């Protein structure tokens, strides 16, 4: 409620002051101003838009999108953009009021919601879906296509360039997908169990043949208890799994509890490394790109489990 009230006040202020841009009125040499919520979306937008777009990402390294709340500065960035790109599927759960109001006033798109519903993983008993779609490269390509469509709509004079850039980016992603499958083939099938702090890797598991278990649910906003820890400990002991993984955007406390629980049962489990789940690495590093993040995760998982 508080977040929604703040958004309403800010939007009213921007409406009175005329803040905002008109992408349709841009000249050929002007850049499209794009604001993306997550770094995964921002990376795709930069690759597709090339020199014709300027992309601002709200969430940086180590930021949890499930818990993220838009600041006044974020709202200004959203309102001053020509195009707003966000994931949707309730990933940005604390920002839904803000994003809904943005959509009433300017061009915006929930890029993950471009994926056909029959390809999504249902979440619980409701009508919601697992939002962590970027861990399936074939599914993430639907989001890439949606970004290209939004850019072409905003700047039709550069549609050919956006189409060409998107084609090249998708070819890179398809190569990354093939490489990932080749690397994972080195892990024995019985060892393909991926245990992490929260349930962010279900699409990854479906795509690459892993049994995936997270201590918390789909959102880090959900809690976990002693029973959840014990169930994971029992699984690790039964399957003789030797490694679990921490996440860059989630506290290590929960996974450390699992490691200690296994130790008490006489089974040694190590921390296999840190995976990038809801956020990518620092901008300017390999892990700060979608490809670099994905390669890091594959290399870390393969090294720990093979």
Curated annotation (Swiss-Prot):
Induction: Repressed by MntR in the presence of manganese. It is found in: Cell membrane; Membrane raft. Mn(2+) binds at residues 66, 132, 198, 278. It is a lipid-anchor. SUPFAM superfamilies: Helical backbone' metal receptor. Disruption phenotype: Null mutant is very sensitive to manganese. GO terms for cellular component: membrane raft; plasma membrane. PANTHER family: HIGH-AFFINITY ZINC UPTAKE SYSTEM PROTEIN ZNUA-RELATED (PTHR42953), METAL-BINDING PROTEIN HI_0362-RELATED (PTHR42953:SF1). This is Manganese-binding lipoprotein MntA. The lineage of its organism: Bacteria, Bacillati, Bacillota, Bacilli, Bacillales. The gene is mntA.
């Amino acid at each position: 409620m508080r977040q929604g009230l703040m958004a309403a006040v800010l939007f009213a202020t921007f409406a009175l002051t005329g803040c905002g841009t008109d992408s349709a009125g841009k000249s050929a040499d002007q850049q499209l101003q794009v604001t993306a919520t997550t770094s995964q979306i921002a990376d795709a937008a930069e690759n597709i838009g090339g020199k014709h777009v300027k992309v601002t990402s709200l969430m940086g390294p180590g930021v949890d999108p499930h818990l993220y709340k838009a600041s006044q500065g974020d709202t200004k960035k959203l309102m001053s953009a020509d195009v707003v790109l966000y994931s949707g599927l309730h990933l940005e759960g604390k920002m839904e009021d803000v994003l809904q109001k943005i959509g009433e006033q300017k061009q915006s798109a929930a890029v993950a919601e471009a994926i056909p519903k029959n390809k999504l993983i249902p979440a619980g008993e409701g009508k919601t879906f697992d939002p962590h779609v970027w861990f399936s490269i074939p599914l993430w390509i639907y989001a890439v296509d949606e970004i290209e469509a939004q850019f072409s709509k905003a700047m039709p004079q550069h549609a050919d360039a956006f189409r060409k850039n998107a084609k090249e980016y998708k070819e890179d992603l398809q190569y990354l997908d093939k490489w990932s499958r080749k690397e994972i083939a080195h892990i024995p099938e019985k060892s393909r169990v991926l245990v992490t702090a929260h349930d962010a890797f279900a699409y990854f598991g479906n795509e690459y043949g892993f049994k995936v278990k997270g201590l918390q649910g789909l959102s880090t906003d959900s809690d976990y208890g002693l029973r959840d820890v014990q169930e994971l400990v029992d699984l690790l002991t039964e399957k003789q799994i030797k490694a679990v993984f921490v996440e860059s955007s989630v506290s290590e406390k929960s996974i450390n509890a699992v490691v200690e629980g296994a130790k008490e049962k006489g089974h040694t489990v190590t921390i296999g490394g840190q995976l990038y789940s809801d956020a990518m690495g620092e901008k300017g590093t390999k892990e700060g790109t979608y490809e670099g993040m994905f390669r890091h995760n594959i290399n870390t998982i393969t090294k720990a489990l093979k």
